[in-house]
Design a protein with these regions (language model features):
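DNA target-recognition domains and sequence-specific DNA-contacting regions of bacterial/archaeal
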Residues: 1-90
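Amphipathic alpha-helical coiled-coil/heptad-repeat segments
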Residues: 89-133
Length: 133
């Protein structure tokens, strides 16, 4: 599983400086994350930089919703040619932004509820421990 959204370490230079999408090439193969920061991609991380004024959040959601056929044996991996062969729709940017805005808000609500559930589970565990000691 990805920790810290796949971020690891620090650098004093950057290879990617604008909005982009990273896609994991190994491990959690094909998992896309929209990036709005400067970074240096390492190991098996594929970086996608839009050629047009597209919404990277929208395309990260689209990639995550797309089945990508992984043909490797042994350790699964995703290569640039495999990812490049995936065809996606490209709606107008205004529609991309509306869709991604809705999905980002939904994800924020889901994360908030997940944090609440974790807190409630800790309270329950604490209460059970106190009840049965």
């Amino acid at each position: 599983a990805l920790t810290n959204s796949g971020l690891y370490g620090y650098a004093n230079y950057f290879k990617i400086e604008g909005d982009s999408i990273t896609v994991s090439g190994r491990g959690e193969v094909g998992h896309a994350i929209a990036r709005h920061c400067k970074y240096v991609p390492i190991v098996r991380l594929l970086s996608l930089v839009p050629k047009h004024d597209d919404d990277v959040d929208f395309f990260a959601y689209m990639i995550n919703a797309t089945s990508i056929y992984i043909e490797s044996t042994g350790v699964p991996q995703l290569t640039s040619p495999q990812l490049g062969a995936v065809k996606v729709l490209r709606p107008p940017v205004s529609e991309q932004k509306r869709i991604s805005s809705f999905l980002l808000k939904l994800d924020a609500k889901i994360e908030k509820e997940e944090r609440l559930i974790l807190r409630m589970e800790k309270v329950k565990a604490s209460m059970l421990q106190q009840l049965f000691i």
